[in-house]
Amino acid sequence: MKEITFDAFYQLYQNDQLSLVDVREVDEFEALHLEGAQNLPLSQLADTYGQLDKDQLHYVICKSGMRSARACQFLAEQGYEVINLQGGMTAFEEL
């Protein structure tokens, strides 16, 4: 599975339009999220992943990087190109 540090991702995020998939639950997402992120909770991902463009690279984030790693594994098995964000939103809050 491909991974990127949050710092490296954040530099890209500030300069480019990226597809960011946030797999935290809705209440977590509503409390704090990165602008432009799409919320597809891991608990519902098996039913909602079809909303994602298969021809696009997707960065996947959660709180710490654990749920996003599971989401990346699932999405990769479905044929999506995904990169896990190490450290997740916890790393963002520490910026």
Kindly give the residue locations of the regions a language model identified.
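Rhodanese-like catalytic fold shared by cysteine-dependent sulfurtransferases
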Residues: 1-19, 26-57, 66-95
